[in-house]
């Protein structure tokens, strides 16, 4: 467990910080600001090409965030300052937003590095767990573990429009084939595996 005030004290090297000193963006009135900051679910840990350890996590309206981890302890290495650059938020406590948010769907992140292409691939599930317009898996890529992640058209995964229908490479969605006894509905929350000369979507 981490105490947000303690994280702020460590990051800023100030000892006189209280809850009142935290970012006002964390709140929307008396409620947590779910459009800007993540739900603490769906963690996925990966290693970068140099052995660095990272955790992508979060879901739905607040987007996907990334924290670097200490490989020896598994503890988060929090950013030392907060910043905002367009739709990319870097937060002392939550880490760096790499995708989604702004009230739109997007969850179940999974990041994998492919040494042959030199890219990190981010998979995410968009949509809902429903039969109509259910989950679909989309992919983005980046040359760096912390982004920016973009699709084939160059659109960033942090694109903050009123909808996310126009971004990401759609890898898989609901489908029905005449030879199948059942329809496949709302595939999502995938992982991926590279084994020798083969790649697998799990």
Map each language-model feature to its residues:
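Carbohydrate-active catalytic/glycan-binding domains of CAZyme proteins
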Residues: 1-202
């Amino acid at each position: 467990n981490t105490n947000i005030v303690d994280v702020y004290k460590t990051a800023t090297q100030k000892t006189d910080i209280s809850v009142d000193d935290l970012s006002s963006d964390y709140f929307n009135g008396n409620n947590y600001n779910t459009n800007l900051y993540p739900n603490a679910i769906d963690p996925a840990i990966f290693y970068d090409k140099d052995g660095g350890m990272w955790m992508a996590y979060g879901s739905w309206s607040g987007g996907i965030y990334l924290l670097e981890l200490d490989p020896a302890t598994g503890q988060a290495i929090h950013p030392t300052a907060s910043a905002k650059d367009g739709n990319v938020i870097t937060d002392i406590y939550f880490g760096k937003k790499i995708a989604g948010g702004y009230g739109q769907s997007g969850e179940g992140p999974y990041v994998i590095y492919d040494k042959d292409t030199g890219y990190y691939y981010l998979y995410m599930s968009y949509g809902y767990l429903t039969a109509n317009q259910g989950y679909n898996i989309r992919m983005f890529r980046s040359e760096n573990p912390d982004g920016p992640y973009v699709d084939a058209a160059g659109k960033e995964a942090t694109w903050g429009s009123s909808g996310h229908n126009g971004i990401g490479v759609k890898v898989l969605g609901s489908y029905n084939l005449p030879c199948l006894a059942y329809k496949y509905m709302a595939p999502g929350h995938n992982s991926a595996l590279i084994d020798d000369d083969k790649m697998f979507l799990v």
